[in-house]
Every structure is written in C-alpha cells, then in structure tokens.
C-alpha cells in the first residue's frame, strides 16, 4: 500500500493540497514538477521542462500544463485548475478528484457523475518525453475527452516573453481543432510570496478531442522528437516495469 496517498477531503482543500509539490526527473535532465492538484504555483513548474544546451545551461518550460475536459451528454466537466491574478482559482477541477497516490507513478482519480477517470504520468528514462495515460474506469454513456495544451517555451527562471519543436501525440487518432488564444494572468503564488515576478500569459493553440470507452486507456505523449504513436502503450508499460513502488519512506 502506498504511503503517498491522499483522499478527496485533502485534495479539495487547497490550503492542504496546494503546498504539496511533486518533482519527477529522468536521466536526460528533464523534469516534471507541479502540485498534487496539478496547479502550478511557481514559474519553475511545468509538465515538461527540459535542458536546451543551445540556449545555455538552464532548463526551459516547454509544456506548462494540460487542461482536460470530460464530456458526457454534451455537458463539459473541466478537470483543470489554475490560479489567476487576484487569487482567482479557475476552473476548479480539483473538486472532481477522489484520490491521489504515487506508489509507482503519480496517479489521480477523478469522478464526474457516473464517470471515473484515472490519469497517470511517467517520464521516459533516457529521453525528453513525458507520457500521460488516461483510463476510463467507469462510464454509463458515451464519453469524450478533450485535451487543451498550455504552452510556455521559456526559461524556467524567467517569464514568458530558435526553440526545439514540441511533438504532442496520442496512442489513438485524435481530432485537432485549431482554436488559438492566450490565457492571460496566470499567477504563481510561491513567486508572489518571494517578492519576484509572478504573473504571465500562456499560449493555447487549440485542443485535441477523442472518444474514450469504458475500460479503455489513451496515452498522450509530449516530447522533442516524433515517435510512432502505436508504440506508446508498449513504451509506457516498459517504463513502468522498472519503477520502484513507493511503499515506505525508505524506498
């Protein structure tokens, strides 16, 4: 049993969940870091942060986060959570979280009505790539998953103002909708507390959308090179097989 496990009561209480940060690294020098409710509170937070030797000895936030939305009967349920200027939290997707654990990989369980969806994140050991596996554990009607990437492309110690290409792929063929706009006024509370610059605007180019069936898993990949999407499930299973289960403080 995982000792890094938090229930709904803690996860929906942002005074308890927001201060809890999670850092994952790999052998290529990339990292993923955010809070356990996937709300970035520092400029260094990001879903995929990588070294770019051509731009100096620093890390660069490529993919800040993803906004996932579950659709049932045409109704959207946004699982994302961000803090905007003035301390405004939106869209409050943390209220759907039922459990978070980190026994082998970070795993968040969401419940939206009759839908139970899990999200697991894992780094590929020797490459600048993160995989996210979405599994629809329960559903009583047709369900659609929409994934909206929020891009930064900046130094991890700077704010957004010759980068590598970022390849975003799915294990199944998604529908892409080009819907470009800026998300304005992200606020990083830890930087605010430190008295350093703490707000920025981030670019959203559009969104991916694909149906997901009960018992089905869909894998999202973000990396600096393109891969064969059909290999993503095997890539995920190979990576998770070498992970150590975190069942105590000592392992």
Place the predicted regions along the sequence by residue:
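Terminal accessory carbohydrate-recognition/targeting modules of carbohydrate-active enzymes
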Residues: 1-250
């Amino acid at each position: 049993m995982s000792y890094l496990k938090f229930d709904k009561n803690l996860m929906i209480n942002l005074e308890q969940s927001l201060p809890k940060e999670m850092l994952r690294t790999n052998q290529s020098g990339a990292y993923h870091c955010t809070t356990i409710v996937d709300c970035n509170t520092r400029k260094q937070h990001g879903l995929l942060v990588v070294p770019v030797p051509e731009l100096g000895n620093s890390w660069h936030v490529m993919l800040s986060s993803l906004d996932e939305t579950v659709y049932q009967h045409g109704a959207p349920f946004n699982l994302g959570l961000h803090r905007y200027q003035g301390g405004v939290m939106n869209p409050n997707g943390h209220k759907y979280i039922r459990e978070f654990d980190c026994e082998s990989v970070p795993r968040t369980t969401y419940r939206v009505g009759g839908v139970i969806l899990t999200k697991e994140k894992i780094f590929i050991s020797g490459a600048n790539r993160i995989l996210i596996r979405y599994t629809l554990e329960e559903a009583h009607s047709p369900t659609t998953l929409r994934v909206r990437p929020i891009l930064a492309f900046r130094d991890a110690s700077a704010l957004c103002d010759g980068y590598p290409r970022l390849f975003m792929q799915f294990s199944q063929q998604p529908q892409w909708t080009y819907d470009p706009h800026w998300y304005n006024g992200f606020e990083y509370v830890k930087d605010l507390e430190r008295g350093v610059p703490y707000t920025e605007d981030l670019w959203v180019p559009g969104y991916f959308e694909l149906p997901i069936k009960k018992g089905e898993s869909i894998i999202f990949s973000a990396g600096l090179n393109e891969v064969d999407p059909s290999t993503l499930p095997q890539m995920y299973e190979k990576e998770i097989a070498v992970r150590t289960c975190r069942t105590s403080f000592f392992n």
